[in-house]
């Protein structure tokens, strides 16, 4: 499983994350952080950008499942990235919509999204718990990177060298 999330406050700083899970456990070596360049289109465009950048690394093994933190718009933009790399039908795609508490699966006909299957969260389900764990980890990792970028921009004089000299 690869889970993706975007963290931002406005459009100035946008951070993205990818966390990898293998056999139901986090695989730290598969974690990636992305500074998102796209400023137009919000989270859906950010998701598409980081997926395009990740999928361009053909030397990395593609996952069996991509989990998107977001609803229909984010998942549809992720689908566009899969389509560009010819991975529709080869890599499963799910959206994890927190507001509506639904798991979204695009229904694909002739390589296009024809509709959506929606499944309510089943908190007792082991499958749901695994998806939730992956989504929470992607969210945590994106937030952590966002804060790191924000601190560098807000407090540029307090880099690692200055901190090590005790001048903060």
Language model features with spans:
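Acidic, glycine-enriched active-site microenvironments
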Residues: 1-168
């Amino acid at each position: 499983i690869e889970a993706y999330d975007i963290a931002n406050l406005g459009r100035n700083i946008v951070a993205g994350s990818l966390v990898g899970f293998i056999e139901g456990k986090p695989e730290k070596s598969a974690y990636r952080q992305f500074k998102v360049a796209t400023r137009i289109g919000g989270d859906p465009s950010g998701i598409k950008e980081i997926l395009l950048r990740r999928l361009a690394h053909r030397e990395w093994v593609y996952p069996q499942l991509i989990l998107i933190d977001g609803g229909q718009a984010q998942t549809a933009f992720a689908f566009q990235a899969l389509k560009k790399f010819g991975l529709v039908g080869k890599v499963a795609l799910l959206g994890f919509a927190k507001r509506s508490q639904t798991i979204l699966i695009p229904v694909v006909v002739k390589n296009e999204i024809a509709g959506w299957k929606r499944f309510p969260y089943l908190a007792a389900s082991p499958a749901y718990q695994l998806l939730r764990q992956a989504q929470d980890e992607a969210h945590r990792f994106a937030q952590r990177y966002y804060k790191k970028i924000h601190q560098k921009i807000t407090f540029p004089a307090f880099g690692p060298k200055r901190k090590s000299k005790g001048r903060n």
